């Protein structure tokens, strides 16, 4: 009798375990707060040109901070400001956790020995900067493979049009909220041609 009871109990426990969703399934469930986001940014945060930039690969901290900036009016965009205002309670936490968990393709710089191979002036700006103009390398803050981290967003694989519009916004002063005014200072030292070239360079770095 005791043996039968044990078998029944084991069967019930096994059935319960099978019903538990896997981690992969949980990651694919779009939280309610993020459901408005996918129409412009894609269900996997892949971005939809020209509606919304890529969110996959951005850090949770960066996404959360930008949403707070939109809510406070520090960062202004006619579409994003009202969207951000819909995120109440733990809405920002849900959105930033969901999209930051989405995988992004790894980016590996072209390396010969210990030296990165620079093909042109754009790559030199990205990896070395131009200290004669007080321009640090983009990778100084955005990481050696432009994968970003913390308050610094991923650039590799981001839409060229988005990178360009944001650099121009920093340049004109219509985008703010950067740490110590760093991005505004950098953007103001770049020419229009350099902005265009850098945007295309990082967009194609995959």
Where are these regions (language model features)?
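Sec-dependent signal peptide recognition
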Residues: 2-9
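N-terminal signal peptide c-region/cleavage motif recognized by signal peptidases
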Residues: 13-17
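Electrostatic cytochrome c docking/interface patches
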Residues: 18-34, 46-51, 104-132, 153
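The feature marks the first
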Residues: 25-73, 77
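Sequence context surrounding c-type heme c attachment/ligation sites in exported
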Residues: 28-38, 60, 64-65, 123-139, ...
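The canonical Cys-X-X-Cys-His
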Residues: 34-44, 95, 135-144, 198
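Axial heme c-ligation environment in periplasmic c-type cytochrome domains
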Residues: 48-54, 70-114, 149-154, 173-206
């Amino acid at each position: 009798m005791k043996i039968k009871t044990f078998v029944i109990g084991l069967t019930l426990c096994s059935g319960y375990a099978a019903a538990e969703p896997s981690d992969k399934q949980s990651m694919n469930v779009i939280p309610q707060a993020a459901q408005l986001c996918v129409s412009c940014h894609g269900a996997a945060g892949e971005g939809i040109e020209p509606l919304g930039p890529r969110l996959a690969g951005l850090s949770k901290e960066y996404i959360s901070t930008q949403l707070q900036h939109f809510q406070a009016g520090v960062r202004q965009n006619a579409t994003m400001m009202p969207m951000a205002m819909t995120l109440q309670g733990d809405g920002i936490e849900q959105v930033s956790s969901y999209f930051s968990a989405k995988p992004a393709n790894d980016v590996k710089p072209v390396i010969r020995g210990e030296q990165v191979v620079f093909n042109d002036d754009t790559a030199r700006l990205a990896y070395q900067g131009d200290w004669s103009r007080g321009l640090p390398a983009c990778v100084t803050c955005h990481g050696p493979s432009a994968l970003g981290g913390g308050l610094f967003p991923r650039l590799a694989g981001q839409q060229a049009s988005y990178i360009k519009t944001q650099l121009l916004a920093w340049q004109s002063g219509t985008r703010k909220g950067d740490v110590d005014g760093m991005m505004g200072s950098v953007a103001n030292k770049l020419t229009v041609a350099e902005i265009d070239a850098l945007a295309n360079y990082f967009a194609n770095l995959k």
